[in-house]
């Protein structure tokens, strides 16, 4: 084991598992939020809205960054793929940030029910990050602006470190790819650091992303051309992620590899939005959803939250 301890790694994994569960629950459930009985058609929301495919990768990035920078008060995380809002919401609930602006978002059964039922719900929470989301400076519904915002935040603030998660589909936008040129503006001691993280999960909404089609060598050379040092990360290996964050290199650019929709019943582009279309009326899909939810061991969630978070 590296300098990162076994207990740290296990806590990272636990957090990812809990947040993945909360994402699925937000997308599908209007009742029985912790699976305290068998799932029924009446537990499923009448209209399913949202995006599952990017959520696991967001949870992986958030948990690992949280562990690495937990004592750094000048660290900021910017989420590019705002359509992965269920993941951001889950993490804000666990960290108590949502509670600061919404007293119903408690870290218990009641709070979990609250965020899940009200996701994509009338007078509830939106399907994408919004100005009402605590700490948000990038909405993320229209992709491409996260990197530019990160560099703007770093300019003139030498104390700041900003990690920005960019989707591989997002990096195809003109604004995002051109924003990599802004790295040169950070030269000198009067500016902060920007840590780009490319979430390479392979697919956008309907096809493989351009960057997923490139070989590792091609992608690395592209990144080097913008003045960065590329660092590959296996998204399913928390120790590897922590080791990558601990590397001392000039202008790191992290490439986080995950499988789109990891953990769900369908992978690749089919999982970009809602991977199960009819669990409210289809018995087989309802069973698939129940098995999917059970894979995260929901019976342990309240105990883990009570022991590790306050």
Report residues per predicted region.
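Structured loops at beta-to-helix junctions and adjacent beta-edge loops in soluble globular domains
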Residues: 27, 80-82, 91, 199, ...
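Alpha-helix initiation and N-capping motif
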Residues: 9, 21, 58, 85, ...
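Cofactor-binding active-site loop characterized by glycine-rich and histidine/acidic residues
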Residues: 31-188
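Short loop/turn segments at secondary-structure transitions that flank enzyme active sites
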Residues: 22, 30, 94, 260-262
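Cofactor-/ligand-binding subdomain signature composed of acidic, glycine-rich
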Residues: 1-51
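Glycine-rich ThDP/TPP pyrophosphate-binding loop and its adjacent helix/strand module
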Residues: 132-309
């Amino acid at each position: 084991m590296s300098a990162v301890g076994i207990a740290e790694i296990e806590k990272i994994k636990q957090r990812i598992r809990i947040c993945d569960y909360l994402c699925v629950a937000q997308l599908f459930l209007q009742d029985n939020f912790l699976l305290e009985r068998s799932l029924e058609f009446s537990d499923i929301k009448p209209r399913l809205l949202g995006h599952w495919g990017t959520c696991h990768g967001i949870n992986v990035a958030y948990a690992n960054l949280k562990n690495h920078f937990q004592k750094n008060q000048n660290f900021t995380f910017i989420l590019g793929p705002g359509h992965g809002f269920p993941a951001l919401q889950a993490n804000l609930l666990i960290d108590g940030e949502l509670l600061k602006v919404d007293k119903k978002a408690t870290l218990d059964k009641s709070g979990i029910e609250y965020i899940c039922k009200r996701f994509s719900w009338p007078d509830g929470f939106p399907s994408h990050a919004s100005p009402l989301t605590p700490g948000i400076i990038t909405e993320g519904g229209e992709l491409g602006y996260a990197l530019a915002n990160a560099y703007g935040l770093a300019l003139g603030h030498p104390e700041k470190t900003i990690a920005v998660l960019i989707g591989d589909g997002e990096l195809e936008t003109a604004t995002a790819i051109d924003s990599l040129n802004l790295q040169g503006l950070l030269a000198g001691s009067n500016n902060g650091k920007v840590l780009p993280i490319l979430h390479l999960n392979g697919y956008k909404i309907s096809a493989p992303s351009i960057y997923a089609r490139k070989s590792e060598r091609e992608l690395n050379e592209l990144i080097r051309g913008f003045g960065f040092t590329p660092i590959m990360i296996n998204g399913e290996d928390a120790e590897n992620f922590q080791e990558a964050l601990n590397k001392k290199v000039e202008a790191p650019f992290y490439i986080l590899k995950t499988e789109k929709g990891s953990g769900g019943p369908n992978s690749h582009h089919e999982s970009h939005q809602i991977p199960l279309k009819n669990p409210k009326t289809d018995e087989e899909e309802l069973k698939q959803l129940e098995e999917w939810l059970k894979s995260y061991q929901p019976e342990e969630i309240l105990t883990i939250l009570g022991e590790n978070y306050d």
